[in-house]
């Protein structure tokens, strides 16, 4: 009996009316045989004292794993009968709600598991319950928007919810809490949401970081008149890099496909894209050139094949240098000086930069970026991938808020050294 008492404590069963009778090891799980019994209460209908009648058929209550195996409690509940009005009543316990089969501790565990980036099917499998039970627990979560405040620094981005459809997300830059997740990213959807905030609240926003997505620019200015727009530095460099890559392909296609020049430009394309200050000076044997060369020597040979390629490469590297040094005057000065001389691929990018000069200057002068929100988007993609996609946007939205806005406390175990 002493061992069974400790089993009760180990399982965290605090109801003293539950008595564990035996523990049976099955092939796939453990069965904890128990009974619920206490003194007869008064009849809820007539007030007479009820009497003990018999025990119900055992309720199969799923429980947490013990020693790495799924467990369930076979709980026989006492039934009471009023011999005055024939009222029947079943004994109740705080272990599980009345007329329910899932215990409270399992519901708590479901809530904890929903914070993790795993699918609801996996949660159901781990806890030996149905997926429908997990979804019902997910639906118990309700997140209400606080329309009385907005953060001073906000990040905007989009992510793919379904194939061919992008959704909008806004995040607090400082504490990383999700402000909102909207099913669409159209101006009407975003405007309708943020107009629910008072103008005084919207004027509290001072900085908005975002990608180079032009429909956001005017919308952000209309909704947040006091906010500065800061473009993400990664996407600015990405525009430059893509222009350089496309121009390199055009130069490469001017040579015969079997020529040495074509093969060299095609094979060592990364050296052209890379920051010249980060080129390795280690010498290796290069089969394309049949000699030992450093990356710098390979690059010099490739640039010697075309004066146009060399000229645009030098402009590209100077722009990278001024951008990384955060010198907007020299960066835009170089763009304005070479706007008419460069290839149309570069002209398109340069005109885009000049059109958004103020926002790019903000990106160079301020340390804010969209990096934190991009990391959040990776977690959202992980949730979506682990769940093999979501058909219901509201369920997906709740998983995002639960996983990213609810902070999970960590217990650190310190292992003693022998």
Report each predicted region and the residues it spans.
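Short, conserved DNA-binding cores of transcription-related domains
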Residues: 1-87, 91-93
């Amino acid at each position: 009996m002493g061992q069974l008492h400790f089993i009760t404590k180990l399982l965290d069963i605090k109801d003293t009316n539950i008595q564990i009778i035996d523990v049976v090891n099955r092939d796939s799980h453990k069965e904890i045989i128990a009974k619920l019994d206490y003194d007869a209460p008064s009849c809820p209908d007539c007030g007479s004292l009820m009497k003990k009648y018999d025990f119900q058929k055992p309720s199969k209550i799923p429980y947490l794993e013990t020693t790495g195996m799924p467990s369930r409690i076979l709980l026989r509940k006492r039934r009471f009968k009023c011999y005055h009005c024939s009222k029947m009543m079943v004994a109740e316990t705080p272990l599980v709600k009345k007329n329910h089969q899932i215990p409270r501790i399992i519901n708590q565990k479901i809530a904890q598991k929903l914070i993790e980036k795993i699918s609801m099917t996996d949660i159901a499998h781990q806890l030996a319950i149905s997926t429908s039970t997990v979804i019902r627990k997910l639906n118990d979560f309700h997140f209400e928007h606080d329309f009385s405040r907005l953060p001073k620094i906000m990040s905007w981005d989009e992510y793919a919810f379904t194939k061919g459809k992008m959704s909008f997300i806004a995040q607090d830059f400082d504490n990383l809490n999700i402000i909102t997740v909207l099913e669409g990213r159209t101006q009407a959807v975003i405007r309708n949401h943020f107009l629910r905030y008072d103008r005084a609240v919207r004027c509290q926003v001072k900085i908005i970081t975002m990608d180079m997505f032009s429909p956001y620019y005017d919308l952000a200015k209309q909704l947040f008149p006091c906010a500065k727009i800061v473009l993400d530095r990664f996407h600015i460099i990405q525009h430059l890099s893509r222009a350089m890559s496309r121009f390199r392909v055009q130069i490469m296609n001017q040579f015969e496909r079997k020529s040495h020049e074509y093969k060299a430009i095609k094979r060592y394309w990364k050296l052209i894209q890379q920051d010249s200050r980060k080129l390795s000076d280690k010498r290796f044997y290069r089969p394309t050139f049949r000699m030992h060369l450093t990356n710098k020597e390979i690059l010099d040979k490739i640039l010697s094949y075309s004066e146009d390629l060399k000229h645009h490469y030098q402009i590209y590297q100077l722009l990278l240098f001024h951008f990384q040094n955060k010198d907007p005057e020299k960066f835009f000065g170089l763009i304005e000086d070479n706007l008419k001389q460069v290839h149309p691929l570069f002209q398109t990018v340069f005109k885009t930069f000049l059109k958004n000069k103020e926002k790019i200057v903000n990106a160079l002068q301020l340390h804010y970026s969209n990096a934190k929100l991009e990391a959040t988007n990776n977690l959202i993609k992980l949730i979506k991938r682990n769940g093999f996609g979501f058909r219901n946007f509201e369920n997906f939205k709740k998983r995002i808020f639960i996983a990213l806005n609810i902070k999970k406390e960590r217990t650190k175990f310190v292992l003693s050294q022998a």
